């Protein structure tokens, strides 16, 4: 049989076109399906995140939210209310008749500050190729103002957008956000000035939202008060963190590091407290090369955290060669701590909300404390401890140190049946110590003697000798030291029971 080559070639071309057409349709269908699935995933992520907001604190609420979804993208608009809710009224205790009210009581019945509302708008582009990149979605965020709010924003930020953020969302739900706050400035002639160089922040979160990393940079801040001449200047601040928040933000673990180039405060005319004139000048304070490190862990259900703050500086004409402060908490029962912290954060009373002011807030907080007291007592079984582990200052080759820790030790189930104060007196533990150079005490006395607040410096050696004779302090070379310890219901001063000979 004779085969027509032309007809065969036409059939081949048609077959290839059909295959290509089918392939193109499949790709289009797959892309469309991927886009639709990406859009669904983004929307569900938004809903989950917004549902979590009111669970964090009583001071933040989602009051308006809309999500206009299209095929290739969506627009989300969310309004948050910051501050006390309008319906957060507290039970007000009985008050005196109007004739007996004084000014202080009238101030206590003042209502809380009006809440502030902030609106964010997110422009979302669905994947799988969102905004020219392979991602489930990209999101561009900005603040939204009404006419009045826009005018105020322009006074501070100029024509720049106050806040912008670009987020790339991965297919597993992880996201990376680059956020920028524009430089801001405000100056009122004869009053105050404010100049901030803005901030940049990158946040990375995994799909389960349990692991967070961030990097923050703030170039600087300059604030001044023309009336008092007071100024506050902050140099460049950088910070980074790597945290696990699978147990919630309250129990986030990991490490945070920060460095502040400088922090300077000066008040040459005082702080404005003196009536009818300038106040007494406050010595200028300059802190430099400040390093901050914080770490937190959870092991065997117990939470521990430490924080260290150190650097160099100058107060007036006195150079500080080194300062360091370390504090922390240990053996904090994680579940109990979270329950207490969540209840506190969710309490309108604890956040100062509701009518009735201070008295009503105190009454409501007492009710809250009574409810949480059993949980607080139960945490004592784990021998919790908090304190200032070390505060050290070096000046002119001399070093001063103070420290203290407070906690509970040896608590039994039987102990927990006792009232809270009885438990504290029996099982509470307190340790504190101080070491100061004698030279510093003499310098402090010389400064205070000018205003008659302290004895003259030449009397200081005699006063220290009297204190040593009575057992209140010890002399160790050029230093004066003191130690106090409370445990098992007894108090010791410098290693001796209080009331013993020499005390």
Give, region by region, the residue ranges found by the protein language model.
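Gram-negative bacterial Sec-dependent N-terminal signal peptides
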Residues: 1-34
